[in-house]
Amino acid sequence: MRATVLCFSGLDPSGGAGLQADIEAIGQSGAHAAIACTALTVQNSQQVFGFEATSKELLLAQAHAVVGDLPIKAVKSGMLGTTDNIAALAEFLREHPEYKYVLDPVLVANSGGSLGDQATLVKAFVELIPLADIITPNTVELRALTGLDDLDTATQKLFEMGAKAI
């Protein structure tokens, strides 16, 4: 059986990001994508109208159901949406240190729409940084996570916060 990557992310009904994009990218790499849906978004390719986050309990139930059935080798997270979901993912990762973890600290949609309270999420993401094997922030996320404008300085700060690879 192919290796499985468990993706924690939101559902974008336009299919341009989130779980759909993860499923396609992981499939193209030859692995199987399993999902734990963190939120249902209301968006199209131009705008985010809102979202409803999955409860922490439901999120963990999805993840544990998949772990009991499929050969998980790695975890990838995108939109988490709430501090409860960030805490739930951190709990899950501590239970499963054998999984490689890719953190994409999503704060806004590609269209620029908010996917949660940015200041609150940034504070919570600090818990995930040292758990990640690689972090893939864009420049907006890198600046938000570190509070620094200069990209070289911000990258160094992210390493100081516990990042292993960026």
Residue ranges with predicted function:
Residues 118-166:
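Conserved phosphate/ATP/ADP-binding segment of small-molecule kinases
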Residues 42-43, 107-109, 142:
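A short, flexible beta-alpha/helix-coil linker loop
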Residues 33, 101-103, 135, 166:
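Hydrophobic faces of well-ordered beta-strands that scaffold small-molecule active sites
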Residues 1-74, 146-166:
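Small-residue (G/A/S/T)-rich helix-start motifs and N-terminal tracts that mark the onset
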